[in-house]
């Protein structure tokens, strides 16, 4: 049987108190809507429709290529939101999943199990329910004396007895598709909110003698719908625990999982060790046998096997096998370290490529440079690459030796096996195997110190 999906992503999210549409707030580095769409994609769906409304264009811009969407111009309730997908789905034979775009913790496995249960029960509608420790705010599942689902009552419409019920509606359903759109034409706004409730179709199905089933979630956390920043932080915490657990199961050592923040799209190889207070964000790849020490931050980068990142920041950069950085180094966007490169204390590199075996041990800035193999940068070296308007490139060939406190005024080229003397200001190209000296000659004025303000006598 064909499977379809409708993802509800039209709400404003007033309680978030944000200019950003609610479904675009991020959990573990990915929007809540993207998490939901990922889970839906794990089920074999013939057609997926996203309902957009508030800030529709911003939401549409984030959708995967080819995703179908419908704009809900007026937000008149969940029933209305589903009904406007009629032109795309109403005539289809099959079962339709309806899910909210602010439920980032729900998994593809749960959705697959929900479809299986729906088909096994030969149901017209199947509700994904959960037993809530505190059901306040959720719609309650009302069952009859035989335990069958009778209806769903929203919090604002519930009486005291109904409010005491702990089985709640998670807001995720599967419906027989044609029955769903037929019932949606019968619902009204006669309720406390004055909206078209999707849940009202359940009572319509029951009155028609159709089967309404309920599948209870094993993990209540999956049911979390995010309506404010408090719930967002709860979703972040739960997702982070889930991500960290999976990495540890896969052979990664996390010294302190409670202070380790790993985004959902990060890949990490076996035998890698990650110490406390580490953040790894975005689309980052980390290979095998990597050491990442306390306080490091890595974002949208590739760190290949046998590398070390010691208390450093790596952004949009690539570290090849056996390279190491830190402590207190900063690889800025566009940096590429070849194999066995060493970047040490308080070194900053931006938009540069360093060849195999090159070393910049301390207190160095390298920007917009192409550096060959086994080049050595002395402490205090900088490439002066910016004139206030334009950035300029520096080229340094294999085996060059850059003396401490050299200032390299780009654009220029330093040749193979060339050497710059300590303290030089390099303003011209340096040929292969040349020694460059670009500093004033030292002169000692004997006895002159006695006339200087600092002098304290014998």
Swiss-Prot record:
- Domain of life, per lineage: Bacteria
Provide the residue span(s) of the region labelled Linker.
230-250
| Cofactor(s) required for function per UniProt | Mg(2+)
Binding-site list for acetyl-CoA: 379, 404, 422, 439
For the ligand (UDP-N-acetyl-alpha-D-glucosamine), the binding residues are 8-11, 22, 72, 77-78, 139, 154, 169, 227, 332, 350, 365, 376
Q: What does the record give as EC number?
A: 2.7.7.23, 2.3.1.157
Q: What positions does the entry give for Mg(2+) binding? A: 102, 227
The UniProt entry lists the main location of this chain as cytoplasm
Which UniProt keywords are listed? Answer: Acyltransferase, Cell shape, Cell wall biogenesis/degradation, Cytoplasm, Magnesium, Metal-binding, Multifunctional enzyme, Nucleotidyltransferase, Peptidoglycan synthesis, Repeat, Transferase
Tell me which Gene3D superfamilies the record gives: Hexapeptide repeat proteins, Spore Coat Polysaccharide Biosynthesis Protein SpsA, Chain A
The main enzyme category here is transferase
Catalytic activity as recorded in UniProt = alpha-D-glucosamine 1-phosphate + acetyl-CoA = N-acetyl-alpha-D-glucosamine 1-phosphate + CoA + H(+); N-acetyl-alpha-D-glucosamine 1-phosphate + UTP + H(+) = UDP-N-acetyl-alpha-D-glucosamine + diphosphate
Q: Which GO terms describe its molecular function?
A: glucosamine-1-phosphate N-acetyltransferase activity; magnesium ion binding; UDP-N-acetylglucosamine diphosphorylase activity
Q: Where is the active site?
A: 362 (proton acceptor)
Q: According to the record, how does the cofactor bind?
A: Binds 1 Mg(2+) ion per subunit.
One CC-aspect GO term:
membrane
Subcellular location as annotated: Cytoplasm
GO BP annotations of the record are: cell morphogenesis; cell wall organization; lipid A biosynthetic process; peptidoglycan biosynthetic process; regulation of cell shape; UDP-N-acetylglucosamine biosynthetic process
The pathway it acts in is:
Nucleotide-sugar biosynthesis; UDP-N-acetyl-alpha-D-glucosamine biosynthesis; N-acetyl-alpha-D-glucosamine 1-phosphate from alpha-D-glucosamine 6-phosphate (route II): step 2/2; Nucleotide-sugar biosynthesis; UDP-N-acetyl-alpha-D-glucosamine biosynthesis; UDP-N-acetyl-alpha-D-glucosamine from N-acetyl-alpha-D-glucosamine 1-phosphate: step 1/1; Bacterial outer membrane biogenesis; LPS lipid A biosynthesis
Query: Region Pyrophosphorylase: what ranges?
Result: 1-229
User: How does this protein assemble?
Assistant: Homotrimer.
User: What HAMAP family would the database entry show?
Assistant: GlmU
The record's function comment reads: Catalyzes the last two sequential reactions in the de novo biosynthetic pathway for UDP-N-acetylglucosamine (UDP-GlcNAc). The C-terminal domain catalyzes the transfer of acetyl group from acetyl coenzyme A to glucosamine-1-phosphate (GlcN-1-P) to produce N-acetylglucosamine-1-phosphate (GlcNAc-1-P), which is converted into UDP-GlcNAc by the transfer of uridine 5-monophosphate (from uridine 5-triphosphate), a reaction catalyzed by the N-terminal domain.
Q: Which family does it belong to?
A: In the N-terminal section; belongs to the N-acetylglucosamine-1-phosphate uridyltransferase family. In the C-terminal section; belongs to the transferase hexapeptide repeat family.
Report the protein name in the record.
Bifunctional protein GlmU
Gene transcribed to yield this protein: glmU
């Amino acid at each position: 049987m064909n499977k379809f999906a409708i993802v509800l992503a039209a709400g404003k999210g007033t309680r978030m108190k944000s200019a950003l549409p609610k479904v675009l707030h991020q959990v573990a580095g990915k929007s809540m809507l993207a998490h939901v769409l990922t889970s839906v994609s794990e089920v074999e769906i013939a057609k997926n429709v996203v309902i957009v409304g508030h800030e529709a264009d911003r939401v549409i811009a984030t959708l995967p290529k080819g995703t179908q969407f419908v704009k809900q111009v007026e937000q008149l309730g969940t029933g209305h939101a589903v009904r406007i997908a009629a032109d795309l789905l109403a005539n289809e034979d099959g079962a339709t999943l309806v899910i909210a775009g602010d439920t980032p913790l729900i998994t593809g496995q749960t959705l697959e199990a929900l479809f299986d249960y729906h088909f096994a029960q030969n149901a017209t509608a199947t509700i994904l329910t959960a037993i809530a420790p505190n059901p306040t705010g959720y719609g309650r599942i009302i069952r009859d004396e035989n335990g069958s689902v009778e209806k769903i009552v929203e919090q604002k419409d519930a009486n005291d007895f109904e409010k005491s019920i702990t089985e709640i509606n998670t807001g995720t359903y599967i419906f027989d598709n044609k029955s769903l759109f037929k019932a949606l034409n019968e619902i009204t706004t006669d309720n406390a909110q004055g909206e078209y409730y999707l849940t009202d179709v359940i009572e319509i199905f029951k009155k028609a003698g159709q089967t309404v089933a309920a599948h209870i979630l094993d993990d209540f956390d999956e049911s979390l719908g995010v309506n404010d920043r408090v719930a967002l932080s709860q979703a972040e915490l739960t997702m982070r625990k889930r991500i960290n657990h999976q990495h540890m199961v896969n052979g990664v050592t996390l010294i302190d999982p409670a202070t380790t923040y790993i985004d959902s799209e990060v890949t990490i190889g076996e035998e890698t060790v990650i110490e406390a207070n580490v953040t790894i964000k975005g689309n980052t790849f980390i290979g095998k046998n990597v050491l990442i020490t306390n306080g490091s931050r890595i974002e949208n980068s590739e760190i290949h096997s046998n590398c070390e990142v010691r208390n450093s920041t790596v952004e949009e950069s690539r570290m090849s096998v056996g390279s190491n950085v830190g402590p207190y180094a900063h690889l800025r966007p566009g940096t590429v370290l070849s194999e066995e490169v060493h970047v040490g204390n308080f070194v900053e590199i931006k938009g540069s490529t360093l060849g195999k075996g090159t070393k910049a041990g301390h207190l160095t800035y390298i920007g917009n440079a192409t550096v060959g193999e086994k080049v050595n940068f002395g402490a205090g070296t900088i490439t002066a690459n910016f004139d206030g308007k334009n950035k300029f490139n520096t080229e340094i060939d294999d085996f060059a030796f850059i003396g401490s406190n050299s200032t390299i005024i780009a654009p220029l080229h330093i040749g193979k096996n060339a050497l710059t003397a300590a303290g030089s200001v390099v303003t011209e190209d340096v040929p292969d195997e040349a020694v460059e000296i670009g500093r004033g000659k030292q002169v000692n004025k004997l006895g002159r110190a006695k006339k200087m303000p600092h002098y304290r006598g014998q």
